């Protein structure tokens, strides 16, 4: 009997040590969340790094389809946990534009130096950037397997999110906001619709709370026909001129095509030609070069036929930075599976014509029954201009009314309210029946590039952030003559309640991470050591022929207690058989130090250059044209 008990103890210790070794190995590969942890970032600003994860997630084994993501943890804890997913357009343009030129925590000062972005959207929300469809940016797929339709894209995205939440279950119960710009105006509604369908049969629902689409390509039939009116409004084309007459003829061809083929198309070549004609017929010579208007910011010019493809200026730093070997290693990019980073993948765009897909505007009425949607437009963008967005709203029927009619008052339109940000006219707000439209002054196709702090104020208001208990200095934002709710702070969380909530979340996330990462190996090793110690003590005790107490175990202290569970009920590893055994050892002292360091890192965020010199900088990119 004694031999059996001794064998059992030895077997348990060996089993625990074996498990610890296996877990330690798994913690360093991409199959665990620890394998995605970004420990350092080349060119990072001074001070501790924001907590982030990055890498690939497989969405289609048969075609070698993998999507790349980059996730940043929030800076402040607000009244609820939120995750904002950001997608750039194209199709085929990388969301690293959004991460490093628009709403992410960092901006590039040059090709090797990062600066903090004062207007980063991670202030009150976790940020998740995804390169999609497959083949975009750092994502990859077999070259004969590029996607062609919007439903294929949304299916891949559901698979991506499923695996992402398996790796990071602490974020699955967050309020989710889907955001992006340009051709993401097609992607975002399709993804939202797919999530709602998935939720119908899922035990754990994904809480999609809203959509934000900037300068979105949503309703092609209305937006194609907005090109010439915008060219008139902005002075690019003079109404009644010979150039105008030529372009009007192409508009007539487009109108005829829509009448014949119907409005249920995402891509019509005859209508695409309108924009090409505007750019080609208004080109001129300047300083010995042939130049044209920048289609993303009509305040600017570019060499023909680029017409904006050389902008924004940050792109000249972004491309070499994202091709650096140390950056690829830091972000866990698979160097064998992807070519050097390019902003927009021509092969993806050429394949993704969505010829069998209906335009996303047809999904909006049903989505507006389930969630609020915000459409925002920079007023200097030509390719996805504000006139087209306003026309699609005016012609759309949703929630019992048409356009911005007020509830119960047909024919009465919601007022346009002036938005003043820090004593400067910032734009116009208009809302009705779950839809909000924001026109943003002096901004391009890439609004957050121009005014990141203003767009964050817009985001935080849309998410109904309540920071009353956090403290800090609020932004000065006024809508319709009334002070807007406090939605922005400076500094770090400074109230007792905020600190306690922060500590609680860090503790919960830490214990969840224990199981998913190799750190659980520390507990198992310590437990195995304790069992081994018990075995040695019992052997000595039997040899001495007398009773003893556990207090005599060299340096090992036994205490009662069990681990806390995550608030959402997910279990960490089972401790029923070890609940009376906790080891006080240098490993646990190290864990306390790590916890303190993690708590400090959790509160850090970004700050960047002042917006006053941002005017004139613009984004790329739909390849919508």
From Swiss-Prot:
Answer yes or no on keyword Oxidoreductase. no
Q: Biased composition, Basic and acidic residues: where in the chain?
A: 615-625
Protein name, as recorded = Pheromone-processing carboxypeptidase KEX1
UniProt keyword terms in alphabetical order: Apoptosis, Carboxypeptidase, Glycoprotein, Golgi apparatus, Hydrolase, Membrane, Protease, Signal, Transmembrane, Transmembrane helix
Write down the superkingdom of origin: Eukaryota
List the membrane topology term(s): Single-pass type I membrane protein
Signal peptide start and end residues: 1-24
In its UniProt record, a GO molecular function of this protein is: serine-type carboxypeptidase activity
Query: Lineage from the top down?
Result: Eukaryota, Fungi, Dikarya, Ascomycota, Pezizomycotina
Which residues lie toward the Lumenal compartment?
A: 25-516
Cytoplasmic compartment residues? 538-625
Q: Where is the active site?
A: 182, 381, 445
Among InterPro entries, the record links this protein to: AB_hydrolase_fold, Peptidase_S10, Ser_caboxypep_his_AS, Ser_caboxypep_ser_AS
**Enzyme Commission number(s):** 3.4.16.6
Please state what class of enzyme this protein is.
Answer: hydrolase
**Record function comment:** Protease with a carboxypeptidase B-like function involved in the C-terminal processing of the lysine and arginine residues from protein precursors. Promotes cell fusion and is involved in the programmed cell death.
Give the primary localization class: Golgi
């Amino acid at each position: 009997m004694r031999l059996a008990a001794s064998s059992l103890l030895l077997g348990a210790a060996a089993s625990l040590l074996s498990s610890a070794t296996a877990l330690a190995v798994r913690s360093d590969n991409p199959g665990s969340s620890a394998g995605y942890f970004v420990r350092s970032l080349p060119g990072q600003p001074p001070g501790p790094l924001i907590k982030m994860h990055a890498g690939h997630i497989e969405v289609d084994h048969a075609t070698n389809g993998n999507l790349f993501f980059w996730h940043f943890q929030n800076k402040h804890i607000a009244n609820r946990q939120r995750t904002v997913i950001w997608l750039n357009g194209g199709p085929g343009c990388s969301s690293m534009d959004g991460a490093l030129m628009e709403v992410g925590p960092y901006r590039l000062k040059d090709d090797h130096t990062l600066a903090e972005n004062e207007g980063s959207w991670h202030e009150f929300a976790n940020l998740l950037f995804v390169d999609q469809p497959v083949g975009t940016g750092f994502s990859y797929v077999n070259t004969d397997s590029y996607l062609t339709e919007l439903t294929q894209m949304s299916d891949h995205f559901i698979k991506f999110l499923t695996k992402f939440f398996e790796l990071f279950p602490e974020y699955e119960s967050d309020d989710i906001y889907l955001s992006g710009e340009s051709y993401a105006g097609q992607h975002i509604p399709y993804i939202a619709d797919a999530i709602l369908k998935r939720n119908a049969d899922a035990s754990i629902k994904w809480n999609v709370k809203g959509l934000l689409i900037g300068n979105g390509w949503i309703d092609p039939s209305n937006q194609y026909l907005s090109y010439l009116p915008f060219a008139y409004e902005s002075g690019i084309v003079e109404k009644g001129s010979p150039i105008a007459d030529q372009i009007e003829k192409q508009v007539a061809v487009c109108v005829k095509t829509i009448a014949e083929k119907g409005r249920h198309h995402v891509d019509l070549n005859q209508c695409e030609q309108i924009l090409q004609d505007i750019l080609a017929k208004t080109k001129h010579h300047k300083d010995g070069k042939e130049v044209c208007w920048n289609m993303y910011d009509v305040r600017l010019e570019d060499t023909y036929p680029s017409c904006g493809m050389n902008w924004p200026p940050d792109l000249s730093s972004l491309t070499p930075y994202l091709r650096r070997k140390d950056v690829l290693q830091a972000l866990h990019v698979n160097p064998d599976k992807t070519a050097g980073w390019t902003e927009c993948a021509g092969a993806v765009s050429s394949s993704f014509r969505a010829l069998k897909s209906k335009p996303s505007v047809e999904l909006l009425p049903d989505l507006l029954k389930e969630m609020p949607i915000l459409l925002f437009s920079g007023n200097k963008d030509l390719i996805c201009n504000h006139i087209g967005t306003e026309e699609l709203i005016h012609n759309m029927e949703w929630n019992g009314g048409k356009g911005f009619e007020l509830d119960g008052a047909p024919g009465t339109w919601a007022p346009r309210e002036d938005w003043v940000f820090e004593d400067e006219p910032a734009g116009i707000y208009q809302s009705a029946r779950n839809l909000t439209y924001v026109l943003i002054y002096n901004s391009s196709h890439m609004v957050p590039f121009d005014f990141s702090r203003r767009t964050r104020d817009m985001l935080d208001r849309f998410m109904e952030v309540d920071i009353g208990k956090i403290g800090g200095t609020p932004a000065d934002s006024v809508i319709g003559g009334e002070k807007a709710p406090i939605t922005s702070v400076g500094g770090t969380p400074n109230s007792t309640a905020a600190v306690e909530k922060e500590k609680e979340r860090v503790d919960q996330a830490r214990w969840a991470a224990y199981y998913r990462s190799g750190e659980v190996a520390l507990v198992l090793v310590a437990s195995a050591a304790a069992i081994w110690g018990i075995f040695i003590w019992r052997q000595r005790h039997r040899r001495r022929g007398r009773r003893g107490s556990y207090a005599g175990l060299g340096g090992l202290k036994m205490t009662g207690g069990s681990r806390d569970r995550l608030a959402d009920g997910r279990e960490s590893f089972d401790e029923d058989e070890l609940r009376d055994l906790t080891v006080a050892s240098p490993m646990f002292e190290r864990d306390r130090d790590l916890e303190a360091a993690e708590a400090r890192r959790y509160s850090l965020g970004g700050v960047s250059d002042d917006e006053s010199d941002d005017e004139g900088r613009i984004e790329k990119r739909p390849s919508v044209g």
